[in-house]
Amino acid sequence: MKKMLKALGILLLVVVLAAAGLILWLSVTEFKPAPVENVEVSAVGALDQVDPEEELQILSWNIGYAGLGAGSDFFMDGGKDVRSADREQVLAYLAGIKSSIQTLDPDVVMLQEVDLDSGRTYRINEAAYLALDASAHAMNYACDFVPFPLPPLGRIYSGVFTTTQGLAIDEAERISLPCPFQWPVRTANIKRCLLASYLPIEGSDKYLVAVNLHLEAYDSGEGKIAQTRMLKEFIEGEYAKGNYVIAGGDFNQIFPGGLETYPNTHPEIWIPGLLEEDMLAEGWRFAYDLSVPSCRLLNQPYDPADTENTQYYVIDGFILSPNVELLSVEGVDLDFADSDHNPVLTSVKLK
C-alpha cells in the first residue's frame, strides 16, 4: 500500500512539475505585440491608386483557416473535432476559397483566420497562396504550442490578411486590441488586432483606410465590447484626419435585425454580442446583408436539412465612414462549402 501511495505521489509530482514547466515556458515565449506595429507590405509590380470616380468592390471573409468547411464541426462550438481536415482537405478548401475570390473579382480582399505556419493546416502558408498584388498580414495568434484541448491544438501562427487586386498599399499597421483573458490562459490565446492598410487616392494626399478585423468570440462579452469601443475610436480618428474608412471583418456580434432573422436557438453553446445602429457616430453606417447568413454554428457538419440543429448568424460585414457611399452589399451564399463563414461583398464609392 505504501509503495502504491509513493508511486502515486511521484506521479502527481511529475504531473505538477510538467504543468508548471509548461506554464513557465508559455509565459516566457508569450506573444506580446506592441500597441502599434508596422506591417510589411508585399507588392508585385507598379500598382494603381484608388480612383475616386470609380466604384470599388471590397470583400470580407473569415476563411476558417481552410479547415472548417461543410464537413467540419469544432469543439468550441459544441462539436467534437479539434482538427477535422487532413492536408488534402485543407488544400481542397484553399483551392475553393481562391476560386471563389477569383470569381467575385473584388478590388480589396479582407480575410480573417489566415494561417502562416500552423500545425492544424500542415504548415501551409495560406497568405502566400491567396495573395493578389499588394498584401499585408497581421498576426493575432502566435504560439508554438497551444496545450488545449485533448488532443491539443499545437502550433498556431495565424492572423488577418488584406490583399488587393491592382491597387497599391502605401503602408500597413497592426493595432493591438484589448485582450480579455488573464494569465495563464492568456499565454496561449489569441491577441486580437486591427490591420489598417493605407491605400493612396488619385489626386489626394488622403488615404482609403481598409481596416481588417476579427473581434473576440469566446469571452464573457466584455472583450467584444472593449474591442468594439477601440475599433470605433480608431476609425473615427482616421476619419478626423480626412481619410476614407472602410472597416470590415468578423465582428462576432450580430448586426441589427440579425437576431430576428436568425433567432439564436442554441444559446447554451454560444451567445454572440449585438451591434446596435446607435453605436455609430452621425453619418457612419453599417453595411451587411440579412438575406444570406454569414456564419454557421460548428456544432455539427453542415446539414441545412437539419433545421433544428443548424444555427445561422449574420456577424460579418462593414462599417463605412460618412465620406464613403454605399452602393450595394451582398452576402454570397456558398453553402459554407469551404469555410464556416460566407463572404460578404460590398460596392462603394468615395464621396
Set out the residue ranges of the language-model regions.
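N-terminal, active-site-proximal structural segment of metallo-dependent hydrolase catalytic domains
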Residues: 3-133, 141-152, 351
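Active-site-proximal beta-strand/loop segments in catalytic clefts of secreted hydrolases
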Residues: 61-64, 112-114, 142-145, 164-166, ...
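Active-site beta-strand/loop signature of hydrolases that rely on acidic residues for catalysis
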Residues: 57-63, 93-123, 197, 207-213, ...
